[in-house]
């Protein structure tokens, strides 16, 4: 049982707001540097890789400062080596580059904390190719965000030719 609703912070407004989480639209670096609140848990969900290394150092420092005495920081990220997604050429290039950065970020995180624990989990997913293509069209991962319309369209065609109906 929680006494307070969890707080979600993002730089974009969310349309699909979870009623069990209070969301505010603000830059996380700004919020963590200015807040006087203390937290039991600070969770970074697939977002830390959007920051520059200098910003990551700052946000980790501010986050540690904002923890209660037994508080925890959890950072969710992709496993740097075990990602088996159906990929098209440009997507693969972007993903490899992103995972290299994630590995460097992991090193930075390790050097920022005396005590840390790393857990990996494997989540096996089966879906239809059509469902996956819709996810690609919606740019479900940050690797797809900056692709041009043409690159995305060509990638979708590549996936259609390269993979079976069930992924």
Which residue ranges define each predicted feature?
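A short glycine-rich, Lys/Arg-flanked "PGG" loop and its adjoining helix->strand segment in the class I
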Residues: 57-72
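Short alpha-helix
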Residues: 97-113, 117, 126, 130, ...
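Acceptor-substrate binding/catalytic loop of class I
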Residues: 90-106, 118-124, 142-149
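C-terminal helical/coil "lid" or tail adjacent to the Rossmann-like core of SAM-dependent
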Residues: 122-166
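Class I SAM-dependent methyltransferase SAM/SAH-binding core
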Residues: 1-32
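Conserved class I S-adenosyl-L-methionine
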Residues: 72-102
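A conserved beta-strand element that flanks and buttresses the S-adenosyl-L-methionine
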Residues: 43
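Short catalytic micro-motifs in class I SAM-dependent methyltransferases
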Residues: 46-50
